[in-house]
Each structure stands twice: as structure tokens, then as C-alpha cells.
Amino acid sequence: MNPYQLREKKGKTGLGAGVWNIGVGTDPFGGPTREPIPMFDRLAVLADAGMSYFEAHDTEILAEQAEAARKRADEVGIRCGMYTPSFFADPVFKDGAMTSNDPAIRALAIENAKRAIDTARVLGAEVVVFWNGREGFDFVLTKNGRDAVKRLVDGFNQVAAYAKEKHGDNIRLAIEPKPNEPRANMYLANVGEVLYLISRLDQSHRHLFGVNPETAHSRIAGLDYLWDVEMCLEAGKLFHIHLNSQDGQRYDQDLPFGYTEPLKDLALLVVLQDAGYEGIVAFDIKAPRTDDPKNIADIVTVSSRNLLSLWEKALAVDRDAIQRFRDEKRNTALAGYLAQCLYG
């Protein structure tokens, strides 16, 4: 399959997806429903599904596998869009990584982050993302929140200093917020908290850091992902984006993009187009445990086709009409116009 491309998009026009998107179907209540696809073979599956970029954790493509992974990616015609250290899978991080009360664990997390940056460079990744997986608490007063902020500031300052010394200023680091799951309460729970944290970093490091918002994570927090993305854009900090769908404030469902809120998704794409977003548009989705192995890439192709359809509809939205509705204070009419653009 030829790679999907977003017509008239500035910068990167291809799409990305994670190797974890096509996993074995496990969930907290049940084991695998499919045999695992070898990790390097997943690169070919994603390429065949029309992806231009793959994403991976350091537990999926190990540091010592990076050169071989890049070679395999070149062979199948896909590039590394994003690489991320796992601060959540190893039991040592069960009560946090950079915010752990144990200084030895905090030091280990920082070393893992540094190694992930080196690995990302070998892979040719466009951005390194840090997700707050275990940063937070389940019971009150088990951590001092003020100390947690200081630890995050110190940790990311150390990571930035290492990145600049080793690789120079041409590297992008993004933080991905999420409000809960797996922890009951998570630090860096939303875009605003991440932007605040970046503002607390040393001034010489702030330009290296941005945000990787995920639409479902905003919804889990009861927030509007359109506004979250607009905050990132206004701050010049939208370094990456993860698209998916979420059916209310439940567990993180990673449903196909365009499934639950297509009108809001249409509006989001209008915002990205008008802002001239140049980064990769990627999916954080998950093949459901009910899907047959031979159809495991459906989650990727369905999301991609929904995105391309909505992208074309967003290009056709009359921006002058939007402005007229605003000027005339016809908010309901504007909503109706967008619905017409969506449904025809």
C-alpha cells in the first residue's frame, strides 16, 4: 500500500502509529488473544498499512537493536517518528520514576531517559516522548507534591543538559500528559501542567521541550482536546500529537480516530491546518482483543481513512463563513454549518 498522505499539510505529510498498536490483545482482565508479531515484523505490518512512521518504547526496540531496527525500517520503507523510554513497565518504577521517593530509582529513570535519547538518534526518531506512566500517587500524602515538582524539574533539566551536550540543540523532547491510569492520580495530568513544568526548567533548556497531547487523555480528564491542542499551539509547544477516540471518561480505550466525536475531530483538523502544524500526525490506538490476527492492521487503516476523509472535509470548510458566524454571534448556526460540512 502507498503511504497515506495529508494533502496540503505543511511539514510532515505522512502518518505514524506505534508498534504497540498491533499487540496481542491483553487487558487487565485477560491474557493474550493473539500470538505476538515479532517486533521487527511489525514495522512491515505498519508500512503495509500505509504508515510513513513507526513509534516504539525502549522495551520494544532495545538500545542494542536500534541499528538493526533502522536497517529493517529502511528495507520496508518506514521511518522512526517517535521513541519513548518506558517509565512504567519495569516493577522498579511501581511508585514513580523521576518522582520516586527513592533517589536511586530517580537516578535510574534519568539514565534510562539519556539512553533513550541516544537510541532515538540511532533510529533517526523525529521526537523523544516522555509519558508520566507511574508518576503520581494512589494514596494521599505518600508523596510530597512540592518535592515531586522539584524532582521533575531537576530530572528534565538533567536530561536536557545531556541531550544538548551529546547531540546539540537539534533534538525535540515532548512530554505526554494523562490524568490517571495506571495511577489513581498522576502528575503532569494535563497540558496546562506540562506547560507549567516547561516554564520551570532552566531557560537554556525550555526550547528543547514541548507537548505530545493525546485526544483520549484529554477526554479522560473531562477536558476538551481542541482547547488542549490550541494551548500547545499558542505556546509554540505542539511537538507531536496522538490521535484516537474515547467513549467518555472511562479507562483509556485507544479507539479508532474519528469513531466517537467526528465533528470535534473535524474542528481539530481545521485548527491544525490553520496553525500550519508541521509535525507528525500519529495514532495511539490499540487493536481490540476481539480482532482476528489476520485483520490486526484494521485499527490502523480505519483510523487513517477516517483521518483522510475528515482532513479533506476540513480543507473544504469555508474559513470566511466561520468568521462571519463569529462576527454575527451566530454560534448555533456555526455548529450547524460544521455539521453540514461533516455530513453533507
Q: What residues fall within each predicted segment?
A:
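Short secondary-structure capping/turn micro-motifs that flank functional sites
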Residues: L62-A63, A89-D90, G136-F137, Q249, ...
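Short, flexible, mixed-charge acidic loops at enzyme active sites
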Residues: G31-E35, S86-D95
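Glycine-rich, proline-tolerant flexible connector loops at the mouths of alpha/beta enzymes
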Residues: Y53-A73, N132, D138
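Active-site acidic/histidine proton-transfer and metal-coordination neighborhood
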Residues: N2-R7, D74-E75, R79-C80, V92-G210, ...
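Short loop/turn segments at strand-loop or loop-helix junctions that form parts
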Residues: A17-G23, P85-F87, F130-E135, I175-K178, ...
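Glycine-rich, aromatic-flanked loop segments that form ligand/cofactor-binding clefts
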Residues: R7-W20, I61, A66-F87, T119-G124
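Histidine-acidic metal/acid-base catalytic patches
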Residues: M1-G50, V140-L141, D154-Y162, G168, ...
